Amino acid sequence: MSKVKKNEDTLSEVLVDVNRVTKVVKGGRRFAFSAYVVVGDKAGRVGAGHGKAKEVNEARGKAKQAAKKRMMKVPLYQNRTIHHDVVGKSGAAKVILRRAKAGTGVIAGGSMRAIFDSLGVHDIVAKSIGSTNVYAMISATFDALNKLASPKSIAMRRDKKVNEISIKSSDIQVNE
């Protein structure tokens, strides 16, 4: 099996957070910078990474490399939204992701918006509950994205055909 070389030119990069951190040593304080970056190809692949260095640009570069290593493929519905609603948690942060109709747009706050823009999602509604810490929210969002499954993958897991597991609202009969 040959590895497919990733085209790094098409990756979009969003700097989500930069902090100045301090290490106290015997001779005083040593300052450094920590950066958190989200990268994606706007076609269903996204990753996030953290980097720390003496300079902001070095920290950003390390974070970008870490994000590229942690990239994941997310199944998208019609290349614009997610297949189903999902909840993700990380510590005290909880994130609810809901699929949306075409034309809705990205309704999400803060760091979640950066993930969806890098992922290539055009229609989604996201709500964060609990902690609004950037790291916790991104972790919770990735937890939710990991739980997503396409109808094709669900059908394969259940040894069924896709049309056997998909339920259309017109197929539901109501007894009156």
UniProtKB/Swiss-Prot annotation:
Keyword Phosphoprotein: no
A Pfam family assignment: Ribosomal_S5
Name of the gene this protein is made from: rpsE
Protein name, UniProt field: Small ribosomal subunit protein uS5
UniProt domain S5 DRBM: residue ranges: 11-74
Record family assignment: Belongs to the universal ribosomal protein uS5 family.
Role noted for this protein: With S4 and S12 plays an important role in translational accuracy.
GO biological process, one term: translation
